[in-house]
Curated annotation (Swiss-Prot):
GO terms for cellular component: periplasmic space. InterPro entries: 6-blade_b-propeller_TolB-like, PD40, Tol-Pal_TolB, TolB_N. Belongs to the TolB family. It comes from Aliivibrio salmonicida (strain LFI1238). Keywords: Cell cycle, Cell division, Periplasm, Signal. This is Tol-Pal system protein TolB. Disulfide bonds: none annotated. Gene3D superfamilies: TolB, C-terminal domain (2.120.10.30), TolB, N-terminal domain (3.40.50.10070). Residues 1-22 form the signal peptide. Part of the Tol-Pal system, which plays a role in outer membrane invagination during cell division and is important for maintaining outer membrane integrity. It comes from the Bacteria. GO terms for biological process: cell division; protein import. The lineage of its organism: Bacteria, Pseudomonadati, Pseudomonadota, Gammaproteobacteria, Vibrionales.
Length: 450
């Protein structure tokens, strides 16, 4: 029964050790050599002392973590040009690099930082020698420089430098892949310190672990954080009143709203993609069942019924259906329910158990926890063909959460007998860990685009 499966997970939530007092620290474990080479030339710093943020290093790390790019190490670059006129295109193409990023940082009279950068198509630059021409609107032949894909400048404060570096990564990623970047997003997660007066803490950080911030602390367990579509609120489960309750909290004001406090179990909150409704799981009638709450009227409707346990709802991109985990077939598998007519279909068949499913933003795949002979690992299933690909080889994987662009998945796993957060690209090639420098972390939730 699913209750037997949920209980060990709940007990595990009570057994975390130290809190992550420092920021999460990302460690790349696999996939660097299989990605597309790119040159992120160190930005030229026109100032005294050290640049407050190493912008080029941040961009390199972002693109590497996407699993699609392999930034060339600085010591292996054929040159470090700061102007496109100085680029030796042939030297870069010999290194297998077809795009490079160059930039400069200056301090203006007002003490602000002026950051300029260019994304350059090396292949086109080599063909045209950086001097391609075309017709202007007036019909004149002019220098077009169409090998320069992006040419931007921004004036920033010191505190904005790191954020802008992520913005550059987003621009470069989208220009080269055609997909939106997710480097300006955040993650929410739960940390626990048994020695603290408030051992259970809900925290948020940039997707790469920087700028960690405490959102909520409690003497009782906190579970299942989920972001609102606007990125301003978190829904979560709290046991602060000695029973499970579902709350929604504004992460900027701290204002909280109680959504569900029924007898027995209240859990697994998940916002609809338009933010108007919240799917939750209640056991007020006996077994676990999925409900939907209208967040404006507070009216609630029951979605699943029967004697089986149904939990872990997740909305389809069009908000017209939900996937959920159910033990109606004996062991946990993932099903889909049509919210208009209530019809239900089993989706997963490969593996003795499949649970914790999420649908990718394009609606093509489910990412889930798949149990096989090797244990609990993340897997991806094609919703059209049913083909399944196991993405991870880590231990006791759980709680997958997909980046808003569908390119990466963050999840909880075990490493050296400790709970850590891990990342894997949606194709399974790139892998990384985000262990806290002091403590254990679980229940990750990736924010929407911010």
């Amino acid at each position: 029964m699913l209750k037997r499966w949920i209980l060990p997970l709940f007990i595990a939530c009570l057994s975390f050790s130290q809190i992550a007092k420092a920021e999460l620290e990302l460690v790349i474990t696999e996939g660097v050599n299989s990605a597309r080479p790119i040159g992120i030339v160190p930005f030229k710093w026109h100032g005294e002392g050290k640049l407050p943020q190493d912008i080029s290093a941040i961009i390199s790390s972002d693109l590497q973590r996407s699993g699609k790019f392999s930034p060339l190490p600085t010591n292996k670059m054929p040159q470090t040009p700061y102007k496109d006129a100085d680029i030796n295109y042939e030297a870069w193409t010999k290194m297998g690099v077809d795009a490079i990023v160059t930039g400069e940082v200056k301090v203006n009279a007002a003490g602000k930082y002026e950051v300029s950068y260019k994304l350059i198509d090396v292949v086109r630059g080599q063909l045209t020698k950086g001097k391609s021409k075309g017709l202007s609107n007036s019909g004149e032949l002019v220098l077009t420089q169409d090998h320069i894909l992006v040419n931007k400048i921004a004036t920033l404060s010191k505190t904005q430098l790191r954020k802008y570096a992520h913005r550059i990564s987003d621009v470069v990623y989208e220009k080269l892949t055609g997909e939106k970047g997710a480097f300006l997003t955040r993650i929410a997660y739960v940390v626990v310190n048994d020695k603290s007066q408030h051992p259970y803490q809900l925290r948020i950080a940039d997707y790469d672990g920087y700028n960690e911030r405490l959102v909520l602390k409690s003497k009782q367990p906190i579970m299942s954080p989920a972001w609102s579509p606007d990125g301003k609120k978190l829904a979560y489960v709290s046991f602060e009143n000695r029973r499970s309750q579902v709350f929604i909290m504004n992460i900027y004001t701290g204002k909280r709203e109680l959504i569900a406090s029924y007898p027995r179990h209240n859990g697994a909150p998940r916002f609809s993609h338009d933010g108007k409704e919240l799917a939750i799981v209640l056991s007020k009638t006996g077994s676990l069942q999925v409900y939907i709450v209208n967040l404006q009227t507070k009216k609630m409707r029951q979605i699943t019924r029967g004697r089986s346990n149904n939990t872990e709802p997740f909305w389809a991109p069009d908000n017209k259906s939900l996937i959920f985990t159910s033990d109606r077939g004996g062991k946990p598998q993932i099903y889909r329910v049509n919210l208009e007519d209530g019809s239900t279909k089993r989706l997963t068949w490969q593996g003795s158990q499949n649970l914790g499913g999420q649908i990718t933003p394009d609606g093509k795949y489910i990412v889930m926890v798949n149990r096989s002979e090797t244990g609990f690992n993340l897997a991806k299933q094609d919703l059209e063909t049913g083909a399944v690909q196991v993405l991870t080889k880590t231990l006791l994987d759980e709680s997958p959460s997909i980046a808003p662009n569908g390119g990466m998945v963050i999840y909880s796993s075990i490493y050296r007998k400790q709970n850590v957060l891990s990342m894997v690209s949606i194709d399974g090639r790139f892998k990384a860990r985000l262990p806290a420098t002091n403590g254990r972390v679980r229940a990750p939730a990736w924010s929407p685009f911010l």
